[in-house]
Every structure is written in structure tokens, then in C-alpha cells.
Amino acid sequence: MRVKICGFTDPGQAQAAARLGVHALGFVCVPGTPRYVDAARLREIAAALPPFTFKVGVFVDAPVEAMRAAVEAGELQGVQLHGEESPETCAHLARTLPGILRIKALRVREPADLEKIALYVDAIEAVLLDAWHPTQAGGTGRTLDWKALQGFCPALPWMLSGGLRADNLAQALDILTPDAVDLSSGVENGVPGQKDLSKITQILHIAQGNTGQRRPPLCDGT
């Protein structure tokens, strides 16, 4: 089970999380949001990380030029798209950002929303399910209805997000079989962007105890 922790803003915390064994680190590249990091900060954090750390930028309907600038500043290996990006936009990124992993986030309000995934299968490498919120694109702390998603198995690797914490992750993984989990506010102590390393350690222990999932292309490009 792979673990991605999103929303780092501090170089030391990002470095420590990578050394703990977090498989992928996420950085919010959305101006005006609580965990936003600009290009200079992103470059500073990236410079503090161990070699081969997998880094993902989070975007909401961003221009390709903005994504390319962030990819270059942070030496990112992946982009996570949380807006209304179309399948055509996602496919276009394969040409404009070659070699960069594309993850499309889908905010789920009801099970019927999952039907949209079929439109993206040929345009992305992985899909992320997050809880729906009327104004926020992620990091809300809201959980999905896991039982309503039971049996969900798309035609590409998928990540579970939305309100995951050390006290509910095991329950979620008893019901669902994602390829990876993605956490942000669930490993904080109330201050956006300030991560609690003890909570991250707990999450890693829970994930390590969960076996039998198929392997997503989050860290080795396979």
C-alpha cells in the first residue's frame, strides 16, 4: 500500500517525511489556498529532500505554463489535477509535460459520479477519489461514503483520499482496495501545512500492514 502525504509547506517536515518512508509528497500549487507554496518555496523544499523522492504538484484548472513552471521549480514527477480539467486537457499534458505522471482527482458526491472515470481512462495514469465540497477542491477533512464505494475497481490505479486519519484508515481499507492513499489534514494538528510526524508514522504502519493491493505507478514509473 503506497502512501502520499499532501500539502507540505516546510522543508524540514518534508525531508523528515521522506526519510520515514512516505512514497510520494504533494505540494499545493494553487494560489490563495492555505497550503500554497510558490515556486521559490517549492524549489527550497525540493532541495532539502533525499534523492529519488517522488514529488507531485497539485493544481486546479491551471494553465499549462504554470504547471510547467512548478514542475521545473520543484523537479516534480507528477501532477494532480483537482479542477474541471477535461479528458482532452489531461491527454494534452502527455505531450506538453512528457514523462510526468497525471493523476485526476474526482470529487465524489454520489456513486453516479464514478461514471466520469471512463472518460479519463486513456488520458491519465491514476485517478484519485476525494470527498465533495461546494467550495474547496481538497484538504477538507471530509470522508467519502466508503460502503457506497465497496467493490469499486476501475480500469486504472486509484487513490483514496478524503478525511483519512490514523483512527479511520484501517476501517477504510477493510472496505475498499485502493492502490494508494492520500492524506493532508489528517496528519496535521489543526494548522494547514504543518505536519505531525508521529501521525505520519502511524499512517505508514497501518499501510504497511495492508497487503494484497495492486501496485500503482506512483514512485517507480511502472
Curated annotation (Swiss-Prot):
Q: Tell me the Gene3D superfamilies matching this sequence.
A: Aldolase class I (3.20.20.70)
**Pathway it works in:** Amino-acid biosynthesis; L-tryptophan biosynthesis; L-tryptophan from chorismate: step 3/5
CDD domains membership: PRAI (cd00405)
Q: What is its EC number?
A: 5.3.1.24
Q: Name one GO molecular function term.
A: phosphoribosylanthranilate isomerase activity
Catalytic activity, as annotated:
N-(5-phospho-beta-D-ribosyl)anthranilate = 1-(2-carboxyphenylamino)-1-deoxy-D-ribulose 5-phosphate
Give yes or no: UniProt keyword Transferase: no
Coiled-coil regions, chain positions: none
What domain of life?
A: Bacteria
Q: Name one GO biological process term.
A: L-tryptophan biosynthetic process
Q: What class of enzyme is it?
A: isomerase
Q: Which keywords annotate this record?
A: Amino-acid biosynthesis, Aromatic amino acid biosynthesis, Isomerase, Tryptophan biosynthesis
Give the family per the record.
Belongs to the TrpF family.
PANTHER family, per database record: N-(5'-PHOSPHORIBOSYL)ANTHRANILATE ISOMERASE
What is the protein named?
Answer: N-(5'-phosphoribosyl)anthranilate isomerase
